Amino acid sequence: MCRRNVILVFCASFALFFTFIIFGRYPGGRFAVLYENATGPSETRPLKAFISSSYFYPTSKSLGDNALALVMSVNLVQTPSFLTPYFQEIVISAENATSSAVVSTPFFRIIPHEQCQIMTIFATAQLLPNVKRIQMVSHDGLTDIPFSPPSAIKRDVVMCIAPLFVSEQWQNFLFAVHIYKKYGGFMNLYLISTINTFFAVMKEYEKEGYMKVQPWPKVNFPGVPMDIADTHGQIEFRSQTAAQTDCLLQYKESAQYLAFLDLDDVLIPRIAPTYIEEFQRIIKGKKPLAYFLYHKENYEAFVTPNSSQFSLKNMFGSLKCRNFRETGKSVIDPQNANYTWLHYPPVLVNGLEKYEVEENVITHLKTINWVEDEVKTGNGTIIEPMYYDNSSATIISSKDIKDIEDDLQRMRNKPEIKKLFAELPKIRYYSDLVLKCYNEKFYDYFYSGRYEKITCPGPQYCDFKQHPDITCMRVNATHIERETLSPVTYYYAKDPYFTDKMGCYAH
């Protein structure tokens, strides 16, 4: 059995640590200007806003008809050198074939702390029907912005996977994507960079309908000095909050539920045969919920680096509970929230409540060991991994393991995928660099109580020393330098694409 420690660690998640230990005093919600101190800095910093998402909804149950939803990264937090301008509303201009309108709307801060200078915000406004042109209005100019419709393909459940960078854990990917397919989930994976052969496998799974690979370009203000807007060192976790909110907005009208996970957070239904049935059972008889939270239990896995020998059956059989609970992740009804932070929406609105799930947990693949002598089972033997508690319960049935393994074999026998599998990485290099960096820059400080040493969290402090034999696909896009407008200059990325000419890095 997999026994729990009597004393649970309250918070193993670095991200949640920021909320409760250091920044609990910042509640989130509508941004109010906090800095109008005449004794402080005298120079006002120009605001720069990067638009990550702009969706237009002809109809929406929660946003209203002809609604625009925006997700932006803005340098809102005051620095020692600059004042923050007085800025409370966004002004939007819209045109259709016959008329035009100008609308002012408040915005809402999503990130509930001020450790990073660049904040993620959300705004929405109802515009005109059949809109043809949308512009952001500044005092001294207009900025045309692109916009797109949300997804119209009906889905029960979408798994929103946080942005990956220098990713090489292909075994983890196969484990997750086949599990999600089995239980009725569609994976939307945000991607910054990954090993080129791993990327090619992802794209084949995208063609087969398992998932969507969504490029996640960096926040960029071309020509803007770093003391005005530091897009390298002052954005929390590779703009993960913006990515997760993008996923919520993208599937707002088409999915019944959205689960927000990292790739190594794998949710396996336990109280019902599918995700949608489990979620419906959880909410049954409860007051309306903004979200429900699954806690994470850490597991260790042992996998082969040789793709020709890799088996999901063997990977399941190798799982060992490590008696450590980490901060969970949320499942959201997209009609009940417009934005979300790393783990959950930062505020509850309209009398909605939250619920912590007790009937199931996320299987967190905290450690994935690449070993030549992995745990192997005979052709007819299936080992069911143990559930975390003191019972004899298991995470998954042998029948479901067999179904998932059969699905893997079906995919790998496709000629193109079979060829790509043979080229998957056999060494782990960047994963170890990132783990070492995060321990040195964040976790070691946290566990030793040296909280003052912790800065804006993210991979920007890691040294990605390039490996001569490893090539990565990395996202790029067109970014345009713009004339400064007051109080805000608006930017966005155009035409994102992946290239193998930019090295293996995060943003």
From Swiss-Prot:
The chain crosses the membrane at residues 6-26. Pfam families: Glyco_transf_92. Its EC number is 2.4.1.-. Its main location: membrane. This is Glycosyltransferase family 92 protein C33H5.2. It is found in: Membrane. Keywords: Glycosyltransferase, Membrane, Transferase, Transmembrane, Transmembrane helix.
